[in-house]
């Protein structure tokens, strides 16, 4: 009974900041959609089409980096604290390689949209938005790798505070660039994408500054091995990367299907695409909340695995199922109004 109570409380401690961070991230997308949708329905279609490609380009490398979270959590649970910093540094180098690869792929946005059979208008405007989006990939991966490390060492609130601040920044910057206020040019969907880029740069700078502050603290630096980095990092991180392969494949399957359906919606025109964007926007928020619960579960399970606690693994897994099911049942009862997204009756 005591173990059940401990696992439940640990799940709540882990889940609260991680879920809050994911909800805030989902809200950022909802706010972007509302601002652009109320500005112009066609612009909403362009940003939706660009995002359907972009979501694949940035979630695949995030899936590949998931091993950092799991392996670092295992080491933390086994009280091998210095190994967590080594895994973080390996992930930092790995994320740099992934950023180059997926940014170069994304720059070819117009070519990708043309190959998918989109009309010239969608290719031109959707490609412009996608080009802005892809330049945020390096900053996303810097943030994600550092945040995975901090979550694994029981510092999930750092990411939560960052994403809340990022939401506030986005609410201020987004309408200014979309509508062209205070002397800024009116950029529409490109302005919203630019705001997203600015916010992601802020997140990367914020979380890396926190890590740097930890490094300057001799006690924390030594405890977590933040200076541990070797020329053999590629071979050393083989098992960590292997964990990410399966998660990346799952990501391709889920987000790939979303991109395919988005392509179909794009073929049917701007209004159909805009409607599809609103529908996906809401469902994505629900998915991100459930995904955050799974992340919290994986951390607690990995900690239990690291200390050889089989009963703790089972208890944490069951707690994750219960919390997820309860959350889903609660969320599906929530109704939303499309008028929040656009005033276009069509």
Task: Describe every region a protein language model picked out.
Residues 8-10, 14, 189, 193-196, ...:
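Interhelical loop/hinge segments that connect adjacent transmembrane helices in multipass membrane
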Residues 157, 168-204, 337-340:
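Membrane-interface helix-loop junctions in multi-pass transport and translocation proteins
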Residues 23, 27-45, 113-120, 176-187, ...:
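Helix-terminus/linker motif at the lipid-water interface of multi-pass membrane proteins
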Residues 14, 18, 55, 95, ...:
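Residue-level signature of transmembrane alpha-helical cores of multipass secondary-active transporters
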Residues 101-131, 330-343:
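Short membrane-interface helical motifs at transmembrane helix boundaries
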Residues 34, 103-107, 171, 175, ...:
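Membrane-embedded alpha-helical segments of multi-pass transporters/permeases
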Residues 1-8, 13, 341-345:
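Single conserved hydrophobic/aromatic residue that forms the stacking wall/gate
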């Amino acid at each position: 009974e005591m173990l059940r109570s401990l696992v439940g409380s640990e799940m709540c401690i882990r889940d609260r900041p991680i879920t809050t961070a994911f909800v805030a991230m989902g809200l950022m997308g909802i706010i972007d959609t509302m601002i652009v949708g109320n500005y112009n329905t066609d612009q909403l279609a362009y940003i939706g089409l660009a995002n359907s490609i972009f979501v694949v380009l940035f979630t695949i490398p995030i899936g590949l980096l998931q091993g950092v979270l799991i392996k670092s959590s295992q080491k933390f649970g086994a009280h091998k604290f210095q190994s967590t910093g080594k895994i973080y540094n390996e992930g930092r180098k790995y994320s740099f390689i992934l950023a180059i690869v997926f940014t170069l792929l994304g720059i070819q946005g117009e070519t990708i949209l043309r190959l998918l059979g989109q009309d010239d208008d969608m290719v031109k405007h959707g490609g412009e938005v996608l080009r802005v989006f892809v330049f945020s990939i390096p900053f996303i991966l810097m943030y994600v790798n550092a945040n995975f490390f901090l979550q694994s060492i029981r510092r999930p609130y750092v990411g939560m505070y960052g994403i809340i601040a990022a939401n506030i920044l986005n609410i201020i910057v987004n309408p200014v660039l979309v509508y062209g206020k205070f002397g800024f040019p009116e950029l529409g969907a490109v302005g919203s994408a630019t705001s997203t880029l600015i916010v992601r740069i802020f997140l990367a700078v914020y979380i890396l500054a926190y890590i740097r502050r930890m490094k300057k603290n001799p006690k924390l630096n030594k405890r977590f091995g933040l200076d541990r980095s070797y020329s053999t990092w590629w071979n050393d991180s083989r098992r960590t990367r292997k964990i990410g392969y399966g998660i990346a494949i799952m990501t391709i399957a889920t987000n790939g299907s979303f991109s395919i359906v988005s392509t179909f919606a794009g073929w049917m025109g701007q209004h159909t695409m805009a409607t599809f964007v609103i529908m996906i926007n809401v469902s994505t928020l629900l998915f991100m909340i459930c995904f955050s619960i799974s992340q919290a579960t994986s951390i607690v399970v990995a900690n239990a695995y690291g200390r050889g606690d089989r009963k703790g693994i089972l208890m944490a897994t069951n707690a994750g199922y219960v919390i997820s099911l309860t959350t889903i049942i609660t969320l599906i009862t929530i109704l939303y109004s499309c008028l929040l997204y656009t005033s276009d009756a069509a």
